[in-house]
Design a protein with these regions (language model features):
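Hydrophobic pocket/interface hotspot
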Residues: 20, 32, 40, 51, ...
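Structured catalytic/translocation cores of nucleotide/phosphate-coupled proteins
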Residues: 20-23, 27, 40, 112, ...
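Short, low-complexity N-terminal intrinsically disordered segments enriched in polar/charged residues
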Residues: 1-30, 34
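Flexible interhelical turns and helix-capping residues at alpha-helix boundaries
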Residues: 25, 40, 44, 93-95
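A beta-strand edge to alpha-helix "cap/lid" segment located at domain peripheries
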Residues: 2-7, 56-118
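A solvent-exposed, acidic/Ser-Thr-rich amphipathic alpha-helical stretch
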Residues: 29-33, 38-74
């Protein structure tokens, strides 16, 4: 296993991540939740959400709090289960635009952990 991330093409992302990103962008909560393990965690803005109910509430809130566009602009991979997808967001949130890392840890073909940070 390599400990240093290396660049990868977005077309090479695992299907579970592309499915999640598609659902997230479309604001399809049911499809997005299906991508997570039963004990998954999401950390966003320093707060951690545990399990499907908290993650669904977070997704619902984040989808309605601001209007924004989101576009994947790059990806790196440490190993098959540790991936980082860089996104550019523009919208009516404070600052108006930001690049955010979506750092995924996969387990058994699903998302076990997602950390979103600058």
């Amino acid at each position: 296993m390599s400990i240093n991330p290396h660049p990868m093409d977005l077309s090479e992302l695992p299907e579970i991540i592309t499915s999640y990103l598609r659902a997230h962008k479309a604001r399809d909560l049911d499809a997005a939740i299906e991508c997570y393990t039963i004990d998954a965690t999401v950390t966003d803005e320093g707060r951690t959400y545990n399990g499907p109910q908290e993650i669904e509430a977070w997704l619902s809130r984040s989808a309605s709090e601001f209007t924004y566009t989101i576009e994947a602009i790059g990806a790196t991979k440490t190993d098959d289960d540790h991936l980082d997808v860089l996104h550019h967001l523009e919208g009516n949130f404070p600052g108006g635009n930001v690049d955010l890392h979506f750092r995924f840890i996969l387990r058994d073909g699903k998302i076990a952990q997602l950390v979103i940070e600058e």
